[in-house]
Amino acid sequence: MPRRKQQAPRRSAAYVPEEELKAAEIDEEHVEDDGLSLDIQESEYMCNEETEIKEAQSYQNSPVSSATNQDAGYGSPFSESSDQLAHFKGSSSREEKEDPQCPDSVSYPQDSLAQIKAVYANLFSESCWSSLALDLKKSGSTTSTNDASQKESSAPTPTPPTCPVSTTGPTTSTPSTSCSSSTSHSSTTSTSSSSGYDWHQAALAKTLQQTSSYGLLPEPSLFSTVQLYRQNNKLYGSVFTGASKFRCKDCSAAYDTLVELTVHMNETGHYRDDNRDKDSEKTKRWSKPRKRSLMEMEGKEDAQKVLKCMYCGHSFESLQDLSVHMIKTKHYQKVPLKEPVPAITKLVPSTKKRALQDLAPPCSPEPAGMAAEVALSESAKDQKAANPYVTPNNRYGYQNGASYTWQFEARKAQILKCMECGSSHDTLQQLTAHMMVTGHFLKVTTSASKKGKQLVLDPVVEEKIQSIPLPPTTHTRLPASSIKKQPDSPAGSTTSEEKKEPEKEKPPVAGDAEKIKEESEDSLEKFEPSTLYPYLREEDLDDSPKGGLDILKSLENTVSTAISKAQNGAPSWGGYPSIHAAYQLPGTVKPLPAAVQSVQVQPSYAGGVKSLSSAEHNALLHSPGSLTPPPHKSNVSAMEELVEKVTGKVNIKKEERPPEKEKSSLAKAASPIAKENKDFPKTEEVSGKPQKKGPEAETGKAKKEGPLDVHTPNGTEPLKAKVTNGCNNLGIIMDHSPEPSFINPLSALQSIMNTHLGKVSKPVSPSLDPLAMLYKISNSMLDKPVYPATPVKQADAIDRYYYENSDQPIDLTKSKNKPLVSSVADSVASPLRESALMDISDMVKNLTGRLTPKSSTPSTVSEKSDADGSSFEEALDELSPVHKRKGRQSNWNPQHLLILQAQFASSLRETTEGKYIMSDLGPQERVHISKFTGLSMTTISHWLANVKYQLRRTGGTKFLKNLDTGHPVFFCNDCASQFRTASTYISHLETHLGFSLKDLSKLPLNQIQEQQNVSKVLTNKTLGPLGATEEDLGSTFQCKLCNRTFASKHAVKLHLSKTHGKSPEDHLIYVTELEKQ
């Protein structure tokens, strides 16, 4: 006994393998059973009880050894509880042993039984066992010896067989049943072997004991409540779920509870008989299988949540079972289509049902079922919130899988709806067939825009909508706040926006505000994609406040709702692969990045709620908007202010796509500003849901033209246009306060614009100063989204830019305020240093990279401030790999590459057939290269090996093509010149390097470097003619970053990309065209 005490603390229960725990439990049960068994064999066994107990102790050494302790130790990290349990168990077992040791006990099993009963009575006298003790005594007095023996055998692990105790939840089998099964079990086992305790029985006892003791034990006396709780969950996790989890391995019969399974196994004999071997063998033999069975039960619990037939809700233990089921029942054909409607009726609260009914009927006459759709989606949302089956605690929803069904059914009418005619369908196949037959899939975009226009313009609907107050939660994209109101305060814009939303939706008048909002979102989503300039004209904007309906407002409303909807992930439209696709404007130069969406446009407008990323994005966008703001303010502080403002007003997002459209128009404008604006829209999109923006951009642009007052449509709510953020146009920028952001929007967006607008906008004159170009672009963009801010005549000029093209977005500011642009022009007018712009662009880039799931601007934007003419090597050092373009730009020093390429070319050997054979560079050459370049020998070897691999595999690499054909073409990475022979190629590279390869081994490093510097000027001049294989023979091009000259635009682009990590689109900014002398 003392030995047991000493050893108990050695291992905390938490660290004892489950198998040992279980084995120990079984052993202990056997030990206690020995005294309780009625068999004569058992009486003999009792003679050896002490030795047996000692043996068992070897298994019980760990604190878990005691049955109770075992349970407690199942997952308990507390060694104290284990020790406590071990000690307790030790004392109890000591008592047990002492009793059986009496000679009487040997010959009189009944006596020993009585003694053991007494021992257990004492043991149960503990407060925690009070109810168990009562049960024990009751059953002891009322049951037969068989029952008594069974009860006591299970007592150590209070098991259900004791009827009263077994009344725990699902395992409450009637006392007679459990007792009888246990009795038969124990008798069977006892006859087969002295220790015969069936592991099924043990498992059952353990389970029941845990459930009962969990309720009984207020303190962690025998079991740790934590352990019990955890184990209880593991064993019973699905007992109450109705999923048949306990399966008989022999016949696959499924039972809801372990008790039923155990009874079945006992009655049918579907279990292994070898589990009744002697204790030592038994423990070893069954420890793994028992552990495995328990682990299976636990794993299956999780698996069944996934391996569930979505039609009938049956759970399966394996994917194979589920597959067989689906194949045999053909349920896989019915899953998304015919789901049990009863599930919906059961699960949807009556109030929800009523709401659904109420909402559906009022469908407004407009697009058939639109109102209904909105109502449905709204009610579906409510259901989602109210549905008791979808609580956070019950993530898996209705146990039989009906949750999927009812959720789908509840929204089916909304989901499976034709966006053209509004007809709902029962199945996706039907909807698809309908779209194909009617050709509505082609008309969706245009018809949606028409509908959107109708909705917007219908005065009756407008009035109705206006009559319904929308909660400020609707996205306050209001920056485009109603044109009439043109509220300067974000609150005002919010209100107007709310109004707009309903107006545009002009869905069921009767529906509650939420319903309308939902509908508006739906309709927005549907219409926005199609609401293009063709439908909304500037003329429309002029009479915009028709019947009290403000087109701009409604547009804003629509966009905001769409954005919020997109954000919430409840798409109501049907025919688009993605939100972005749904809202891409045909006129926009580039689709908004899907990532943009993630930046929330949500009801953060309410104010600070807006997520930081969104706010930051907005801030970034803002900066463009506030071109006028003083550049002297520190970039960081300015950005912070912008972020704050943006956070305060989510309207920024409302700006929507207009910026996108502006993008395209800007591109045409060819002014750098256009570029900037373009970028803005992208950024905005990133922050705000692009999907909404797109449509709003379209409609918003049109609206903007009409009621500039609604400048908010830009998303700069009332921005107060003080700053007349030309970028407001990028309106997304800011819903933020009318105060202009202090960062020059041009500088903040320059990098972004450069990246995205380079292709779209062709500067009027390539030689035009980049700042001037940006200015123009921003002006054009600004005038479009002009917020009713400072009136600027520039807006007119911009209008010209944009409106020359019918594709250009409508100038929403045209009809109302044109002053907006002026301030922007002023701000732009003050020339900003290119380096300053770059710094800001870096800031923007960092922010966008961090905030937006996917920055709308390519990483190439990360153009560090290389503008100050630092050498290309320095520029390379400054550019972190993160900022570099991965595919086309390498981290290699261009000079090192030239040396390696020249050496490799010199190592090629020409055969008599005219083909070239690659021969390796000798160690000496490698050493020379290493000494000169500072590259390690390993790096050089890797480079050579990579080149050889590429040549063998594809016959070419970056600087050498067609080697395998016998007609190799060598390319100069620096100037893009092509050469047919290795010798001319090497000599050309040497002109770049400023020294001969032969000198590499002879000249000291410092001398070579000096020679390089001296020859650099000559090289630049001579390279012109050498590399001028392209069209521009009349001029040379100089890289502003490193002052090198090149013979062609292509060469400069290559150089910018490879050496400086700049996008070729940026060549206008970093390249100077020089007349040849």
UniProtKB/Swiss-Prot annotation:
Biological process terms in GO annotation: anterior/posterior pattern specification; middle ear morphogenesis; regulation of transcription by RNA polymerase II; soft palate development
PROSITE patterns recorded: ZINC_FINGER_C2H2_1 (PS00028), ZINC_FINGER_C2H2_2 (PS50157)
Compartments, record wording: Nucleus
Domain of life: Eukaryota
Biased composition regions of type Acidic residues, renumbered to the chain: 26-36
Keywords tagged on the record: Developmental protein, DNA-binding, Homeobox, Metal-binding, Nucleus, Phosphoprotein, Repeat, Repressor, Transcription, Transcription regulation, Zinc, Zinc-finger
Principal subcellular localisation of the protein: nucleus
ZnF locations on chain (C2H2-type): 246-270, 307-331, 416-440, 970-992, 1037-1060
Location of region: Disordered: 1-109, 139-195, 269-298, 467-549, 647-720, 848-873
DNA-binding region: 885-955
Listed Low complexity bias regions: 164-195
GO cellular component: chromatin; nucleus
Phosphoserine PTM positions: 765
Tissue specificity: Expressed in brain; strongly reduced in post-mortem elderly subjects with Alzheimer disease.
Record's compositionally biased regions (Basic and acidic residues): 269-284, 496-528, 647-665, 675-708
Biased composition (Polar residues): 57-71, 139-152, 853-862
GO molecular function terms listed in the Swiss-Prot or TrEMBL record: DNA binding; DNA-binding transcription factor activity, RNA polymerase II-specific; zinc ion binding
Similarity section: Belongs to the teashirt C2H2-type zinc-finger protein family.
PANTHER family: TEASHIRT HOMOLOG 1, TEASHIRT-RELATED
Protein task: Probable transcriptional regulator involved in developmental processes. May act as a transcriptional repressor (Potential).
Associated disease: Aural atresia, congenital: A rare anomaly of the ear that involves some degree of failure of the development of the external auditory canal. The malformation can also involve the tympanic membrane, ossicles and middle ear space. The inner ear development is most often normal. Different CAA forms are known. CAA type I is characterized by bony or fibrous atresia of the lateral part of the external auditory canal and an almost normal medial part and middle ear. CAA type II is the most frequent type and is characterized by partial or total aplasia of the external auditory canal.
Assembly: Interacts (via homeobox domain) with APBB1 (via PID domain 1).
Protein's UniProt name: Teashirt homolog 1
Primary gene name: TSHZ1
